[in-house]
Amino acid sequence: MKAAITSWADEVEADYVDGLPPSKEYVDGDYKHVTEYKFNDEGKKIKVVRSFKIEKKIVSRAVAKRRNWVKFGDSKLDKPGPNSYTTKVADEILMNYMGSKDFEHAQDPLDAGKPMAKCRICNGEHWSVKCPYKGTSMDMESKAIAAATAAVGETNKTGKYVPPFLKDGAKGRERDDSSAVRISNLSESMTEDDLEELVKKIGPYTKMYLAREKNSGLCKGFAYVHFKYRKDAAEAIEILNGHGYDHLILSVEWSKPQN
């Protein structure tokens, strides 16, 4: 008669009726194997076998001394090293995950309403190079100043702040062109992007105007660039005057004040 085959769980239960058997561990070369017994969520006894690779590290004297401290409390009988049941080796970090709808609500509604681009010519919500009034920007500048000057009379009654260039007598002042240069002998295919690429390496500028034909939209052959600093304008004249560009020789000079 053959002996009945029993599982390891039945053998453990027969030897340890009142509880789980103690954990066992043994070292095999550079590896340590630990066998533990515990109950799972269904109340059944299970065996957990874990393998650890042993590594030797050089630590400071303070760390080595701290590892030899006598344990106390629930960890009084624990072996050297942290116990996952009583010790946390890292700080607990709580994270809140946001969905796509929560992210949309978290955005500032004021920022969402701001335009991505603003035209320097007509203040529209587009780039200056795509402005439909680009060919008549010089005329629009004088009209915009006249309209703003007329609006000052109404804003003065409400006590609002009036910029210095719009106060009484300011419209008679001459425009500051001390840092403006005139670039001529440009090709018909010249664009604002080409002009910006030509001058941006010299220094920062505050305004740029490329003269174009109304009907064809081609370049008239000249442009104006207002640099932020006069020394950069002088450097632009020195570098670009007589410089070859698009099979033409550029002519760069100081911009003459308008009469």
Curated annotation (Swiss-Prot):
Location of this chain's protein in the cell: Cytoplasm
Domain RRM: 179-257
GO CC terms, sorted: eukaryotic 43S preinitiation complex; eukaryotic 48S preinitiation complex; eukaryotic translation initiation factor 3 complex
Main location (coarse class): cytoplasm
One Gene Ontology term from the biological process aspect of the record: formation of cytoplasmic translation initiation complex
Function: RNA-binding component of the eukaryotic translation initiation factor 3 (eIF-3) complex, which is involved in protein synthesis of a specialized repertoire of mRNAs and, together with other initiation factors, stimulates binding of mRNA and methionyl-tRNAi to the 40S ribosome. The eIF-3 complex specifically targets and initiates translation of a subset of mRNAs involved in cell proliferation. This subunit can bind 18S rRNA.
Annotated PANTHER family: EUKARYOTIC TRANSLATION INITIATION FACTOR 3 SUBUNIT G (PTHR10352)
Protein name listed in UniProt: Eukaryotic translation initiation factor 3 subunit G-2
Lineage of the organism: Eukaryota, Metazoa, Ecdysozoa, Arthropoda, Hexapoda
